[in-house]
UniProtKB/Swiss-Prot annotation:
HAMAP family: PGT_MtgA (MF_00766). Keywords: Cell inner membrane, Cell membrane, Cell shape, Cell wall biogenesis/degradation, Glycosyltransferase, Membrane, Peptidoglycan synthesis, Transferase, Transmembrane, Transmembrane helix. It comes from Mannheimia succiniciproducens (strain KCTC 0769BP / MBEL55E). SUPFAM superfamilies: Lysozyme-like. Peptidoglycan polymerase that catalyzes glycan chain elongation from lipid-linked precursors. It is a single-pass membrane protein. This is Biosynthetic peptidoglycan transglycosylase. It catalyses: [GlcNAc-(1->4)-Mur2Ac(oyl-L-Ala-gamma-D-Glu-L-Lys-D-Ala-D-Ala)](n)-di-trans,octa-cis-undecaprenyl diphosphate + beta-D-GlcNAc-(1->4)-Mur2Ac(oyl-L-Ala-gamma-D-Glu-L-Lys-D-Ala-D-Ala)-di-trans,octa-cis-undecaprenyl diphosphate = [GlcNAc-(1->4)-Mur2Ac(oyl-L-Ala-gamma-D-Glu-L-Lys-D-Ala-D-Ala)](n+1)-di-trans,octa-cis-undecaprenyl diphosphate + di-trans,octa-cis-undecaprenyl diphosphate + H(+). The chain crosses the membrane at residues 26-46. Pathway: Cell wall biogenesis; peptidoglycan biosynthesis.
Amino acid sequence: MRLKTLKFPFVNKKNTRTFKKKCGRFLSYFIGLTVALTFLFRFVPIPFSAYMAEQKLAHIIQLDFDYKVNYDWISLEDISPYMQLAVIAAEDQNFPNHGGFDWNAIKSAIKYNEKSSRIRGASTISQQTAKNMFLWHGQSWIRKGIEVPVTFMLETLWSKKRILEVYLNIAEFGNGIFGVEAASRYYFKKPAKRLTQSEAALLAAVLPNPIIYKANRPSLLVRKKQAWIIRQMNSLGLNYLKKL
């Protein structure tokens, strides 16, 4: 007796081609929109980032309607040079020199991750800006794949100063606290232009995870990171910013 082969009407070449076309069309729209927004935001302040929207939506889904995004855009000239240097010292000391990706840091991270149970990242300030601006958070090869061309776009269309300016304005420094101006006023009751070296280093120390690491209640680990950042800042010197 001959068995009939089961056929699923929703799995065929036509549906596969249609799905691929839709994916290709979506990717084309996404790339086009990203290029347009990247060019636009080369000149105008960022009204909000994808990560801000993601956080707001996540809290609404959880029925937390009290969550608010605390965000104030300011120009790079209104941000303390100590704060500018602090994030470079903490996150990406090769920022003035690379084209969006620090290949030496990536190689070091791969070697470290092969030997350690803890994961070390190697994302540059440019990559983090691309992620916060246009993408979603979380470990995903899809996101990482999209992050690469978006980072190249930022490096191509924006200056290093603009990338740093946007990064400092949209980075999260606490629950609902986005940007260094909002963080400075929340934690230190002063504008970001008046941040001291110690205060700037403390804010930079919480950047890996500002929900766990808190600037208003710094743990011993955060204090150690702050002290390390200050040493790195002293080693680099404020003149390092002239390379941007």
